[in-house]
Structure formats: structure tokens, C-alpha cells
């Protein structure tokens, strides 16, 4: 059973930054990621709010973080963590093996919130990633559901590929950046369904349309689309932390700006921890803070 000074669960910006800082401090580091390094930012078509980079694709930024952590000597593994156990040494059990560590950083991020409609999990034509799946709908009509920056960015990306994009939002105004809204309003192949919710997915095994309801008038309509891209928020991915530290009512891990949890030797970084602002830069900042706190913990045991 291999032992590391610090194990990090989650390979997004917070986890990769933590790996960089911990390795620079001379600690042995294991980072475990179950899906793809870089987290959700890796699927973003453009990142324009990262200091020092005017514009970069999410995939390129993810590659840069990964390559830096790897070059510094962090052990980076694509393994799903199934269980974590507390103790003088933490035990991390994955689908490939078991590891121990002196300090554990939880940087598990968030997962997509769904609409909760019948057929959503099995029907072809439902996606949470415009960059990943947009090319499948070239020249077709699609819908984007959501009102934040992710939904607006997805709609802009899809407008370059698809015949028509309908943006569906349950409120009367978008929550995303005004500059994105203005960019969408200039597109001739984009329309908006405001104060509107999706009530049903139409089609057998393949999506052919949506049933919609206006939340103000109650009017019900249908919209023919080949694809639905959901961007309706996220939920913290904190099921693993239950064995180590409690979560708050929203499912987030409570800890201060020092990223120290209530469990000795356990730290939280990025979107999974309770905080006011969740951005790429704050995730990286959390990773640095958590790594330094974990290094200090290792010095004291």
C-alpha cells in the first residue's frame, strides 16, 4: 500500500493547483481524478477572466495546469475514489487500489443539476457540454436551458454550428454577464423563451422536442428540437466527505478561508467548500491555500 504526504481528490483547477504548491513545498503528492483532468473548465470554449491570459480555451488551460503538476513530480491518476477513511493516516480506496496519506485535500468540485424529467437519463439528445457534443447538431435546431454564464456561452458556441438556438430561462432576466446577453441578442439564429420551463421531453429514445410552460401566463407550447443542452446549475460533489467531515444544508463542506475542515488533516478546496464566490481564480486560490495548510499539518505530526 503506497503512502503519500498529501492525497488530493479531484483534478480540477483547485486540485491541480494544490498539487503544484504541495510539490513545490517538497511533499509527495497523489492526485486522483475520476473523469478528466481540468474539471468542468476543460469543456469551456473560451476562458477570458483568468489573470494574465486574454483568451484561452478551457482545454488548453487544463493542459497547462496538468503539465505543470506532472513536471513537478505529482502522481496524477485517473481513478475513481470509492471511499475515504479517517485515522492517523487517511485511507483512500479507489477502483484500482488503496492508498494512505498524512493529509487529504478534498477538491471534488460540483456536478450538473438536472431538470428531473422522465427520460432525461436515457434519451439521446440530452447534453451538458456544448463544446463536447455541439458538432453532432450542426445545421439542426437545438435548445439551451439556463440563465447563467454557462448557458449563455453554450448558446453562443452553438449558434455558430446550429440552424437555430432557443434559450429557455425560467426567469424574466438572465443572471449571466450582460456582455454575453448582448452578443446573443445580435445573433439572427437565436431566440429566447423567458419565464419558461421545460415540462416534458418529447420523443421515444431520441429527443424530438420539448413541452414548455410559461410561468406567468400558464400557456403551454411545444418546441421541435434535436438537442437540449442543460445548464441549470450545479450541486456539490461531497458524498465522499461524509465519513470525514459534515456538510452544510446545501451539501457544501464548511471551512474558513484557511480551507481547514473540522476533521484533523482534512482540507477542502474549490467549489465543493462553503463560500460566497465560485470562480476559476478562487478555485486556484483555494488550491494554493489548502496545499500550504496541508504542508503545515504534515510538519506538525
Residue positions per predicted region:
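FAD-site-proximal beta/loop scaffold in flavoenzymes
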Residues: 24, 121-136, 230-279, 286-289, ...
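Internal hydrophobic alpha-helix adjacent to the cofactor/substrate pocket in enzyme cavities
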Residues: 156, 163-164, 283-301
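Glycine/small-residue-rich loop that forms an oxyanion/phosphate-binding "nest" at active or ligand-binding sites
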Residues: 76-136
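Residue-level detector of alpha-helix initiation sites
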Residues: 12-13, 36, 110-112, 148-150, ...
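Glycine-rich dinucleotide-binding loop and its adjacent helix/turn
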Residues: 110-149, 153-155, 159-161, 254-256
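A Rossmann-like FAD-binding core segment of flavoenzymes
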Residues: 69-93, 98-100, 160-256, 296-300
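Beta1-alpha1 glycine-rich phosphate/pyrophosphate-binding loop at the start
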Residues: 4-72, 152-177
Amino acid at each position: 500500500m503506497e503512502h503519500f504526504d498529501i492525497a488530493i481528490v479531484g483534478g480540477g483547477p483547485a486540485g491541480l493547483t494544490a498539487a503544484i504548491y504541495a510539490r513545490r513545498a517538497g511533499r509527495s503528492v497523489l492526485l486522483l481524478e475520476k473523469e478528466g483532468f481540468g474539471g468542468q473548465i476543460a469543456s469551456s470554449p473560451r476562458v477570458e477572466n483568468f489573470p494574465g491570459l486574454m483568451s484561452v480555451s478551457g482545454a488548453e488551460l487544463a493542459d497547462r495546469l496538468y503539465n505543470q503538476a506532472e513536471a513537478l513530480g505529482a502522481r496524477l491518476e485517473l481513478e475513481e475514489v470509492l471511499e475515504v477513511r479517517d485515522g492517523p493516516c487517511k485511507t483512500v480506496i479507489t477502483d484500482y487500489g488503496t492508498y494512505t496519506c498524512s493529509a487529504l485535500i478534498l477538491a471534488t468540485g460540483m456536478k450538473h443539476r438536472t431538470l428531473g424529467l422522465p427520460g432525461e437519463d436515457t434519451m439521446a439528445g440530452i447534453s451538458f457540454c456544448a463544446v463536447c457534443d455541439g458538432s453532432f447538431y450542426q445545421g439542426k435546431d437545438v435548445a439551451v436551458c439556463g440563465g447563467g454564464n454557462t448557458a449563455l456561452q453554450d448558446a453562443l458556441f452553438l449558434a455558430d454550428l446550429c440552424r437555430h438556438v432557443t434559450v429557455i430561462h425560467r426567469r424574466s432576466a438572465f443572471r449571466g454577464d450582460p456582455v454575453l446577453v448582448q452578443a446573443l441578442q445580435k445573433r439572427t439564429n437565436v431566440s429566447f423563451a423567458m419565464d419558461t420551463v421545460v415540462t416534458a421531453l418529447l420523443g421515444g429514445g431520441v429527443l424530438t422536442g420539448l413541452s414548455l410552460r410559461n410561468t406567468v401566463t400558464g400557456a403551454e407550447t411545444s418546441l421541435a428540437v434535436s438537442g437540449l443542452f442543460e445548464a441549470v446549475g450545479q450541486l456539490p460533489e461531497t458524498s465522499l466527505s461524509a465519513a470525514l467531515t459534515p456538510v452544510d444544508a446545501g451539501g457544501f463542506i464548511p471551512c474558513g478561508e484557511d480551507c481547514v475542515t473540522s476533521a484533523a488533516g482534512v482540507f477542502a478546496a474549490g467549489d465543493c467548500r462553503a463560500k460566497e464566490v465560485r470562480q476559476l481564480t478562487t478555485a486556484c486560490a483555494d488550491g494554493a491555500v489548502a496545499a500550504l495548510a496541508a504542508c503545515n499539518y504534515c510538519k506538525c505530526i
